[in-house]
Amino acid sequence: MSLVAQAFAASKIVPDVIPTPPSVNIELKYPSGAIASQGNELTPTQVKEQPNVSFNADPDSFYTLVFTDPDNYDGPELVYREWHHWLVVNIPGGDVSKGDVLSGYIGSGPPEGTGIHRYVYIVYKQPGKLSFDEKVLTNKSIDGRAAFSTKKFAEKYSLGAPVAGNFYRAQFDDYVPLLYKSLGV
């Protein structure tokens, strides 16, 4: 079992988010200089801007990138549903900037008092260029982000098992209220 697969299993991303772990790492470098590394702790301040994403990719294939928080809270109770932060599809080769953005990037914003959250990046190799019928979401609102299921999304579009993944952990910091204000929360 690869180190990525071991980290996903140890952190319970398998089975909380996906049934099968990826085996290859996604490199995630943020403009702040922070680097995600299979469960290290970063701050919302460090990850507020969209990262540079790289992964081993076949230049003739298309990929889907999902960024999700499976530790979503409704008030003080953990409700075990995902809140997706970024969704990019039809990525040609590994060039995320040329993919179709279905959900604009929103950085981590764990509510105060909810402890540490897992923030998970998953890449799927698509069977070809696909048509997606999801509502396109901007990064200016939280509408349509909650109650997401990476597993159901992957099943709906026949994406198969994930090919790459990475994650970090984060908890509330002073940037979170600023993020909420920018989202109208």
Positions of the model-derived regions?
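N-terminus-centered regions that define maturation/targeting leaders and the start
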Residues: M1-V185
